[in-house]
Amino acid sequence: MTALSAQACWLVEPGRAELRSETLPKPTADQVQVRTLHSGISRGTETLVFRGEVPASEVERMRAPFQSGDFPGPVKYGYSSVGIVEAGPAALLGRSVFCLFPHQTRYVVPAVAVHVLPDGVPLARAVLAANLETAVNALWDAAPRLGDRISVVGGGTVGLLVAWLAGRMPGCVVEVVDTHVARREVTERLGVNFAVPEAARDEADLVIHASGCTEGLATALRLAAFEAIVLELSWYGKLAVNVPLGGAFHSRRLLLKSSQVGQVATAQRSRWSRRRRIELSLSLLTDPALDALITDAAPFAALPAVLARLAGSTSDLTLCHRIDYT
């Protein structure tokens, strides 16, 4: 097979991305060549990377599986790619697959790095898989119980996926807390409740914080009941965070716990591989209600401008921004 060229999105330096051409290697017997149809922007992490806010202490731990280059740049970053296998083992030829690959028109990876989409999962929706994997891991860390009152502070893509999953547990009452009233519509489509911070229900058995801002963390601590868990799912990068541990934090014996998808949650780690976890996440994407989380789409050629817009705005209500390839 003649080697092909591909285009990839590179962060040249903080605040500036561009499309670059590169030549693909010929796939070996245990590799596949994938033609990309869609990719998803993981807004929280990718905009933080775009702004050059990865702390020096985290540059190795925050590497994406198929990242090229290094932080702060030039770096090729991303981890939510969906496409069609056009070369490789016969069992995979023509199959629709998900891969933790950056934004690129075509790529060659080991065959074990792609995951065949389950029946009933559209390619366009599969870009949510990486964020849903984060949500799955968060709930493993949080360990909600039947009948729990659960508050999710921060109605971004990950927070809403956490709420959607938790809302499927029998007896659990889930409320998404966000400063943007416009989030009410999407929460209702996902079958969970909504409140602005000042009207949020307190005495929550479990609070999951995913807003990425210190005010949201303060709200999360305020809503927690006696001896409740507050799970911190936000990643702040270089941002210094003011954690309000005064007031009733100690008298209520609250547990503030972190969760990060880079490791399988402790309770599951001895039995679950990362591959099993992502395949579970893909299998959960059959619900059409999740399409409400993909609020925007743009062609691949527009990706550098899209990243700049998302990274430069805190008021933009975009959830998952899908990139489409032709």
Residue ranges and their predicted role:
Residues 25-41, 49, 53-101:
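Glycine-rich beta-strand-centered segment in the early N-terminal region that forms part
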Residues 181-183, 214, 237:
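Helix N-cap at the beta1-alpha1 junction of Rossmann-like dinucleotide-binding domains, i.e.
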